[in-house]
Amino acid sequence: IIGLLKKAAEKEGIIFGLSSHRLENAWFFNGGMEFPSDVQDTTITLYGRRSEKEVYSEDVCIDFLKHTHELIDKYQPQLIYFDWTVNKIPDYFNKFLAYYYNCSLDWGKGVIVNAKHGYPTNILVGDVERGKLNEMRKYPWQTDTSIGKHSWGYVNGEENKTPDQIIHDLVDIVSKNGNLLLNIGP
């Protein structure tokens, strides 16, 4: 599926990027251990290795690196977005950054890493989820938000933002050296 998305994006001249939540999989799906679900099936690798909430064993960190390196090697994304917790594993995340940035030199094209917490904004593009900044930033930054006022996906009865609200946010964000990643949920 990723390969097909990359091919379609490139056909249209769109820069191809990926989002990875692999690190959060270590604890995010643990609730599925409390009732019968596919999270309990150890033959399914979708969920990665498990750990207690926000405790990252070496196995979990190595799994994160292997999975992320595989995505880089197979698909050469020009952008990788991380939600939440990469700041909790600085040694491993620094290895990822070095690998990805060195790959970009081999490819002869620039790359971008988006993350939320704990890294200087001259190393990667900081992300503010569903928020804005009070003033302009020297380095580029991003906010990610959804057209839904409360959800990222389908919720019965969800109220969407108006076009005027979205345009107002976009103008404010861009005027402060930011960009808007807009989720259009189902």
Positions of predicted regions on the chain:
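Mature catalytic domains of secreted/periplasmic carbohydrate-active enzymes
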Residues: 1-186
